[in-house]
Structures are given as C-alpha cells and as structure tokens.
Amino acid sequence: MLQSGEGSPTLPKRVFKIIVIGDSDVGKTCLTYRFCTGKFPEKTEATIGVDFRERTLDIDGEQIKLQLWDTAGQERFRKSMVPHYYRNVHAVVFTYDVTKGRSFQGLPSWIEECERYSLNASEIPRILVGNKCDLKDQAEVDTNSATRFADANSMPLFETSAKADSEMGNIEAIFLTVAHKLKSQKPMMKQDYPNMKRATVLSVDKEVLRTNEAPCSC
C-alpha cells in the first residue's frame, strides 16, 4: 500500500536519505519533482550543488519519509559537495537518459564513486532508472543492454519518463521498491515532529546554487 502523508496525524519516525545521481541533463530533478508533487515542471533551474525534496509514504501501515537528494551531474559543480551528499546515505538511484548513450556509458564511474564512499551493493539498496522512455524513437540505449548492466550490478531496472503523465505509476513504483527495501532496515535517523497533516516538498537553499531558469530535461 502506497499513500502520501496527507491525512496522517504525525510525520514518520523513520527517515531515509536517497541520493539520485547520474550525468547532467538526464532528468534527475524532473524525476524527483514528479514523484514528490505528481507534476512535471515546465521549467527548472540547473542543479549546481544539491537540491532536496521529501515525501512521506504509508508502507503497510508504517509512515516512512523519503528524503531525495538530487545531485549535480557536472564534475566542476560537485567536487566540494561529494563528501557531504554521500554522508549517511540509505539508498542510491542511478539515472541515465535512454536517448544519450554517453550517460549510460558513464554509469560505471558513478558506481565506482559510490563504492569509494562505502556505498556497496551488499549494504545499500540501489536502483537503475532509464529516463525519457517517451522518446523511444530517439533511444540510444536498448532495454536488453540496460537489463544486462542492471543484472551485473545487482540492481532492478526501471524505464520511465518524468514527463509523461502515464508514467506516474512507474515512477511511484521506483521509490516504492526503494521504500520496501529500506523498511526492514534499522533507521539511521530518527525525528520527532509536531502533528502535521501533509507531507512537504522542501528545497535547501544553503545547499543549492542555481543558474537562471532553463527548460527541463525530462
């Protein structure tokens, strides 16, 4: 059972930090925005540091909060932030653009970076997401290749589109899969909040440096 936190008497006791990583312009911001708001942003600002959103879920009667850290894909923007956003991570969502083969070819370097910070597959749930599947006629990464890569790295694969309204259920399934994997684990962060009727979507200004508005890469 998957629900948003609306109508719940309290916010969850268990909080999980999930980082969404991958090359620049693969649609990480739109993916997290779609999951947290149910909408596709017509415009977004390029993430230079870290953008932060969260959503409260009801998983089998237990309230769980997912904190989604959307990280910059460009190396020159990430160097000073890397130690910070890899701290206390509970799960990783690796993202590539199905229309850009280079973003898929770059996945091993993202996996290596995670392992340098001790985010090993045996300890940290990992998910592989191929975004922009609404542009299948422009695809440079076929499903079979992505499946082989996911299997080799012990990750489930989801192909979806943050832009297509019809894909909302698939996007929910991505994070529901993560939530179920995390539900049975010992929480690393605990919080006690006053009563609050709905989940919130937050942006941490101190962690985010932004450029001017630009069209979103879905």
UniProtKB/Swiss-Prot annotation:
Cited InterPro entries: P-loop_NTPase, Rab33A/B, Small_GTP-bd, Small_GTPase
SMART domains listed in its UniProt record: RAB, RAN, RAS, RHO
Main subcellular localisation: membrane
Keywords (A to Z) from UniProt: Cell membrane, GTP-binding, Lipoprotein, Membrane, Methylation, Nucleotide-binding, Prenylation
Lipid-conjugated positions (S-geranylgeranyl cysteine): C216, C218
Subcellular locations according to the entry: Cell membrane
Domain of life: Eukaryota
Recorded topology in the membrane: Lipid-anchor
GO cellular component terms attached to this protein's record: endosome; Golgi apparatus; plasma membrane
Modified residues (Cysteine methyl ester): C218
Biological process according to GO: Rab protein signal transduction
Protein family per UniProt: Belongs to the small GTPase superfamily. Rab family.
Listed name of the protein: Putative Ras-related protein Rab-33
